[in-house]
Structure formats: structure tokens, C-alpha cells
């Protein structure tokens, strides 16, 4: 079975490098499922969960907050603004960030404040989704 080479990098580190039979990334227009042989594509990433399905069906779950995905027929490169393994996320901090963003949304006085609050809320919700996905996967 053909496999994809997968690299997830930030400006600070290479978070993941390996092979996979399937990858799901959070594109700005929705989730993209990528199999070997995918047409070349460059797309922006939104905050969300990256799922890397290994050859043995184990799953590596990562959280990304923005960046770009460069997809080639046998390779997926994610250049993320922020990337963290889901198991390393702090659920209490993500819940607190979500609550703070919701309060900021309600109290925002300008379009800039509102947009910032929306972005912070999207990131917190995406972190919580990654945590939940990783939790379900462990069962």
C-alpha cells in the first residue's frame, strides 16, 4: 500500500515526521482528507485537529493554529504557526481561554476586538476538540 510522508513543522521545531496512509487537515474551507496520490495543493490552515492515520491504524492527533498545508501526491507538509500534540494540551487552560474569549465577544467595543475574540474562541474550541479526539482514541 502506498504511503504519504508527513512533516509538521513550526518556526521552532519539527513536531512530527513519519509516514501515514491517510491525513486529515483543517483547511480554511473545511477538513481535507488526503490519501496517497492526492493532487498537488497549497492551502491555508485554520485552528483545528490534524489526524495522521498510521499504517497500523494508530492515529497521531495534533492541534494546529494557522499556517499552510503543502500537499503533493506522496507528501504532506504542514507549516504551522502553532502546533502541539493533542496529549500535551492543557484542558483546563483551553476551557479558561474559551470562557475568556466568550466574555470578550460579549464586551467587545470595536470590530477589531470582536475579530480577535472570535479568533481566540476558535482556537480554544479547536484545542478542546483535539483533546476530546485524543481522549476517545485512547479508549
UniProtKB/Swiss-Prot annotation:
Stored HAMAP family: ATP_synth_epsil_bac
Function noted in UniProt: Produces ATP from ADP in the presence of a proton gradient across the membrane.
Tagged with keyword Ion transport: yes
Cell compartments where the protein resides: Cell inner membrane
Superkingdom as given in the UniProt entry: Bacteria
Quaternary organization: F-type ATPases have 2 components, CF(1) - the catalytic core - and CF(0) - the membrane proton channel. CF(1) has five subunits: alpha(3), beta(3), gamma(1), delta(1), epsilon(1). CF(0) has three main subunits: a, b and c.
GO cellular component: plasma membrane; proton-transporting ATP synthase complex
InterPro entries the record matches: ATP_F1_dsu/esu_C_sf (IPR036794), ATP_synth_F1_dsu/esu (IPR001469), ATP_synth_F1_dsu/esu_N (IPR020546), ATP_synth_F1_esu_C (IPR020547), ATPsynth_dsu/esu_N (IPR036771)
Listed Pfam families: ATP-synt_DE, ATP-synt_DE_N
Signal peptide: none
Topology relative to the membrane: Peripheral membrane protein
KW Ubl conjugation (keyword) present: no
Protein name per Swiss-Prot or TrEMBL: ATP synthase epsilon chain 2
UniProt-recorded Gene Ontology molecular function terms: ATP binding; proton-transporting ATP synthase activity, rotational mechanism
Keywords tagged on the record: ATP synthesis, Cell inner membrane, Cell membrane, CF(1), Hydrogen ion transport, Ion transport, Membrane, Plasmid, Transport
Gene3D superfamilies according to UniProt: ATP synthase delta/epsilon subunit, C-terminal domain (1.20.5.440), F0F1 ATP synthase delta/epsilon subunit, N-terminal (2.60.15.10)
UniProt record similarity statement: Belongs to the ATPase epsilon chain family.
